[in-house]
Amino acid sequence: MDDVSKCPFSGGLKGFKNKDWWPNQLDLSVLHQHSNLSDPLGEAFDYAKEFKSLDLDALVKDLHALMTDSQEWWPADFGHYGPLFIRMAWHAAGTYRIGDGRGGAGTGQQRFAPLNSWPDNANLDKARRLLWPIKQKYGQKISWADLFVLTGNVALESMGFKTFGFGGGRADTWEPEQDIYWGPEGKWLADERYSGDRELAGSLAAVQMGLIYVNPEGPNGKPDPAAAARDIRETFARMAMNDEETVALIAGGHTFGKTHGAGDASLVGVEPEGADIAQQGLGWASKYASGKAGDTITSGLEVIWTTTPTKWSNNYFENLFNYEWELTKSPAGAHQWTPKGGAGAGTVPDAHDPSKRHAPSMLTTDIALRVDPAYEKISRRFLEHPDQFADAFARAWFKLTHRDMGPKARYLGPLVPKEELIWQDPVPALDHPVVDDKDVAALKAKILAAGLSVSQLVSTAWASASTFRGSDKRGGANGARIRLAPQKDWAINNPAELSKVLAKLEGIQKEFNGSATGGKKVSLADLIVLAGNAGVEAAAKKAGVEVTVPFAPGRTDASQEQTDVESFAVLEPTHDGFRNYLSGKQWLSGEELLVDKAQLLTLTAPETTVLVGGLRVLGANAAGSKHGVFTTQPEVLSNDFFVNLLDMGIAWTPVDQGEHTFEGRDRKSGAVKWTATRADLIFGSHSQLRALAEVYASSDAKQKFVKDFVAAWTKVMNLDRFELKA
């Protein structure tokens, strides 16, 4: 294109952006991603409805046929695409991490940068192109996100393995997710994420930039199986897997297929996002011989683990323990392992040439399962009990591919397993009539007469509901887990104060349920939210605005037995800008952490703004902190936060070296009038947030402020009410 310089958009596209001029500028774009403006299917599109109309049997049949329909442009190893599709599904799901719930297979992100071009995803572009005719045939009845996972399941089934089940319901997104922090590195395979004694930063799980899990050659390419085991344990734990699940996943996945390192890796071309336009989204074009089939280079490793690479067997463990292993190198120069003394020669088939046979081979991360004492014990048990291995792999694979979907109620289709699994955070089914409008009014009156403050009511409801994460659909008010371990003991929830509030609400619940007729009941989960609503209404009334906060009963109360304490521990907030809470060492600024929390709550910038302003004056700060409480009339739902923040009569100065907290002094008298954190002052400092704050600080904003606060509040209270959105 010769006239690129004449394009009116060229300068805008290539010129400096605000972020280039001001690298530290707070980025709010993550609060507005995945809008209808980027969705070609439109706001009215209902994926669940489309999926329910899908002929799933026909789709599965087509996928089975695809497995052995080898294409000349990318021939199937061993005549079967199953191993390639298992890797595709694994890598789609394997980006999930428990720290913030981000990543995973839930939105089909493997189609977009950076994931479509990660070194660890090399040649998975071919898998997606092989799938395209089937996706094209079934159209919008199956999302790419669901198709990735279902194809992985069918691949396993086609090679003789019985999977645990499949739940559909993953709706595609249409642009890269910008909210996920993949690491600080600016180069592929760098590992600046570590500090101290190999301590992994923040919520990160993978060991290097561009890897899904760990380096198969060992830490930083050093072939040390014991050190690799340490990396494996840390990384898989951060992806919600225990030792048994980890061994099962590694061994189960490596029962099939091979790795690819036929020759010099320097002959492999650039990734899809860096490829020429004529490549049409394909990358890693190789100049080594034919560049495909037996000449394929992907990881640089050339490993075939078993004698039956397209059939489920126990041969992975048989080979792992029947041979003694020595370090060698692949044709591409990568570290791998082969049996000592030439043992096993001729037992493994070649992927493309029937006249060739090989010895089995292993990765450093495979040898780790024999070297690490805990992994070795599990591996030997699986060797001796293949049925236990098959069950463990089936369950771990299901968990891997469904972990980011949230509760079982979100799963769609006839293949959903009936068994309730603890990691799905189950809540009891609703088995009683719920309260009506008359009951709601009576309950709110009792709550307001119970001697609890607006601050207590609002804080408790927020603490319960705001555990929700839009990333993996965990947390939220349903289940009333705020009364259970570990949430009842979290420092941010002020356990002593929380127990008093819950005791009062439990008393009201017991009284109502004991006197209600017709089997009608109110759950504590519902009552906590209703109490928060009552507090908001009372505070609005004090501000001169009559409002009814919408309330949808139907939540139920989970038991401690339904609550995995260790699993829920990762939901404990280390920060919540909405409550002006910050604990320990953080890797982001207070304002960045506020945006991070808002994004997990699926909030927009206007919703974030109005909620912070409202929660401050309602007294919802953790531990009763006065930071950001810019009002002389607390527990009144006024716009005082914005009015006083934008008051030019106040000058702000930091009071600590890290500039986390600030004093606001009267410019004339010099007296301290307010204190604040970065999560407060950002609404006056950041030009976009200040523009929003000005709306709510205006003299005509009283009604709008309350109305918008109630709408955003209700959204948060109902974030985990998936049945309301069905």
UniProtKB/Swiss-Prot annotation:
Q: What is its EC number?
A: 1.11.1.21
Q: Which GO terms describe its cellular component?
A: cytosol
Q: Which GO terms describe its biological process?
A: cellular response to hydrogen peroxide; hydrogen peroxide catabolic process
Where along this sequence does the record place binding of heme b? H254
PROSITE patterns in the record: PEROXIDASE_1, PEROXIDASE_2, PEROXIDASE_4
Q: Give any GO molecular function from the UniProt entry.
A: metal ion binding
UniProt keyword annotations, A-Z = Heme, Hydrogen peroxide, Iron, Metal-binding, Oxidoreductase, Peroxidase
Name what cofactor the protein needs. Answer: heme b
Q: Name one Pfam family in it.
A: peroxidase
Tell me the segments the record calls region Disordered.
Answer: 338-359
The active site of this protein is located at H91
Q: What class of enzyme is it?
A: oxidoreductase
Q: How is the cofactor bound?
A: Binds 1 heme b (iron(II)-protoporphyrin IX) group per dimer.
The family assignment reads: Belongs to the peroxidase family. Peroxidase/catalase subfamily.
Q: Show the HAMAP family listed in the entry.
A: Catal_peroxid (MF_01961)
Query: What does this protein's UniProt record list under function?
Result: Bifunctional enzyme with both catalase and broad-spectrum peroxidase activity.
Q: How does it assemble?
A: Homodimer or homotetramer.
Name of the featured protein? Catalase-peroxidase
Q: Please tell me the species this chain comes from.
A: Bradyrhizobium sp. (strain ORS 278)
Encoding gene (name): katG
